[in-house]
Structure formats: C-alpha cells, structure tokens
Amino acid sequence: MLKMGVVLFIFLVLFPLATLQLDADQPVERYAENKQLLSPDERREIILHALGTRCCSWDVCDHPSCTCCG
C-alpha cells in the first residue's frame, strides 16, 4: 500500500511540477527568438559593443562608408 502511495504521489504531484512552465522563462525565450532574427552584421555590432571593441581602426572611422562606428 505504501508503494502505491509513493507512485501516486510522484505522478500526481511531482511530475506535474516538473513539467510546469514558469512565467519567468518566457521573456528569455522571447528575447532569444528576437535575437535569432538579426542579420549577422547586427549581431556583430551588438557583440562588439558589449565587448567594448571596434570593428575597424580609428583612421577608417572618419570614412563616410564606415558602418562600424557610425
């Protein structure tokens, strides 16, 4: 009888809790989906900005066609 109670407890209480999707997980998934839609150039800009680095040298940044710093 005790074994049946343990099995019922696992399937009726623990299993639904383990499969429950938390609300806090959803914005992170939505943010990750939005990041996948970015082009490679946009991703590179975000990563370089976060790292604090530049994709070109200082003398090239004065050029009007520079898309890195502009």
From Swiss-Prot:
Keywords for this protein: Amidation, Bromination, Disulfide bond, Neurotoxin, Secreted, Signal, Toxin
Post-translational modifications reported in the UniProt record: Two short peptides are produced from this precursor; Conotoxin tx3a-b is amidated at Cys-69 (but has no bromotryptophan), whereas conotoxin tx3a-a has an unmodified Gly-70 and a bromotryptophan. Two elongated peptides are also produced; Conotoxin elongated-tx3a-b is amidated at Cys-69 (but has no bromotryptophan), whereas conotoxin elongated tx3a-a has an unmodified Gly-70 (but has no bromotryptophan).
The protein, known as: Conotoxin elongated-tx3a-a
Tissue: Expressed by the venom duct. Is present in all duct parts with a highest content in part 2 (proximal of the venom bulb) and then decreases in concentration toward the end of the duct.
Family according to the record: Belongs to the conotoxin M superfamily.
Domain of life: Eukaryota
Signal peptide positions (record): 1-24
Residues with the Cysteine amide modification: 69
This protein's GO CC annotations: extracellular region
GO molecular function, one term: toxin activity
Prodomain positions: 25-44
Subcellular location: Secreted
Record comment regarding domains: The cysteine framework is III (CC-C-C-CC). Classified in the M-1 branch, since 1 residue stands between the fourth and the fifth cysteine residues.
Cysteine-cysteine disulfides: 55-68, 56-66, 61-69
Matching Pfam families: Conotoxin (PF02950)
Record-linked InterPro entries: Conotoxin
Principal cellular location given in the protein's record: secreted
Residues carrying 6'-bromotryptophan: 58
